[in-house]
């Protein structure tokens, strides 16, 4: 028989899955980008490449998907004739990140209780 805690954990995992499946955050690289921006506030795409391990084309694709989904915004800045692209979270991106942390935190607490 399944315990109430196990049932709650299963429901939390389902909720996390649903939250992520309705967004461009089905990619672990995109989730890492959102988490990095939540911590770093505003980052150059070159720095996001280092964090994720993605190449230039890949990071540009991930950033485009997140921007189209309304999770981040980008800004091109000229720097000695060399454009730099910065990314930062939108309110929607920050809200998603906070809800994701809340769900993961609850999952971890409940999992610890079930031991």
Where are the language model's segments positioned?
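Amphipathic alpha-helical dimerization/coiled-coil segments
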Residues: 2-17, 24, 35, 91-115
């Amino acid at each position: 028989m399944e315990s109430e805690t196990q049932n709650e954990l299963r429901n939390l995992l389902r909720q996390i899955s649903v939250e992520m499946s309705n967004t461009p955050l089905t990619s672990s690289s995109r989730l890492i980008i959102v988490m990095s921006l939540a911590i770093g506030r505003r980052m150059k795409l070159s720095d996001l490449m280092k964090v994720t391990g993605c190449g230039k084309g890949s990071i540009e694709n991930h950033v485009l998907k997140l921007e189209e989904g309304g999770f981040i915004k980008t800004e091109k800045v000229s720097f000695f004739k060399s454009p730099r692209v910065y990314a930062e979270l939108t309110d929607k991106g920050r809200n998603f990140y906070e809800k994701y942390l809340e769900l993961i935190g609850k999952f971890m607490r409940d999992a610890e209780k079930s031991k």
